A protein has these predicted regions:
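Conserved class I S-adenosyl-L-methionine
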Residues: 1-42, 135-157
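Class I SAM-dependent methyltransferase SAM/SAH-binding core
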Residues: 49, 54-94
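A conserved beta-strand element that flanks and buttresses the S-adenosyl-L-methionine
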Residues: 106
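Hydrophobic adenine-recognition pocket in adenosine-nucleotide-binding enzymes
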Residues: 110
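A short glycine-rich, Lys/Arg-flanked "PGG" loop and its adjoining helix->strand segment in the class I
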Residues: 118-130
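Acceptor-substrate binding/catalytic loop of class I
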Residues: 138, 157-175
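A C-terminal cap/extension of S-adenosyl-L-methionine-dependent methyltransferases
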Residues: 174, 178, 182, 186-231
Length: 231
């Protein structure tokens, strides 16, 4: 049996990153929702750093940015490159970028996979320019988060493979907000869930994608975004 939170699963399933009915389908839907929080570029040559970019699922929804994606997976990065992302292999806890270089930093579906999520957050804020935007999505450390993401989420079509998550790593929302504030970023949180109507249509083969809807509850899957205070 695989250990929980085994990153090797991403390599084993590398051919599924862009499959509309594969195990990463929901990641595609979440990426589209993530892009809604990315502002239009404010300057020519604006840089968007996409941390744990995987196969580059954010790329179709982003225009006008120099899109650089960082990931540890050697199998995912070529797919990101094929979709227009400049790939960098590296560790999200030790970013190989200078301070204050990025106009936008995105960290989607990765905080719940590291043991030091606040260190990842600090690194993301370090490379973000004053006035730049930070965009996150992750899973809350709650009973609902564990039930929806693991008990149900890892067993339904479009959900991730079993044992991909370790619920012990799910994110404390209050600690996340407080840590971001110490870095000069005041986060706004909102929940996300799939449209039930779209999901049923997707199951029936009548849709190729599912809209992710914003909710007031952040007890499960949630987004966070904020602007770094100018210095």
């Amino acid at each position: 049996m695989r250990p929980l939170n085994d990153p090797g699963q991403y390599d084993d399933l590398a051919d599924l990153w862009w499959q509309p009915r594969g195990r990463f389908a929901m990641l595609q839907w979440i990426a589209a929702a993530r892009a809604r929080l990315v502002p239009a570029p404010a300057r020519d040559g604006a840089l968007l750093l996409d941390l744990a970019c995987g196969g580059g699922l954010l790329a179709p929804h982003i225009t006008g940015y120099r899109h650089v994606g960082l990931d540890l997976s050697a199998t995912a990065l070529p797919q990101a490159r094929a979709h227009g992302v400049v790939p960098v292999r590296g560790d999200v806890l030790h970013l190989p970028f200078a301070d204050e270089v990025a106009d936008v930093v995105v960290a989607g579906e990765v905080l719940e996979h590291v043991r030091e999520p606040l260190d990842l957050l600090a690194e993301a804020c370090r490379v973000l320019r004053p006035g730049g935007t930070l965009v996150l999505d992750t899973i809350a450390n709650t009973r609902w988060g564990r039930f929806s993401a693991v008990t149900v989420g890892e067993r339904i079509p479009a959900g991730p493979p079993k044992r991909l998550h370790d619920p012990a790593l799910f994110v404390d929302r209050c600690a996340l907000v407080a840590a971001a504030a110490r870095c000069g970023v005041h986060l706004t949180l909102s929940g996300l869930r799939p449209s039930a109507v779209d999901y049923l249509a997707w199951l029936a083969g009548r849709r190729t994608t599912v809209r992710m809807l914003t909710t007031s509850s952040t007890a499960g899957l949630f987004q966070a975004h904020g602007r770094k205070e100018p210095t």
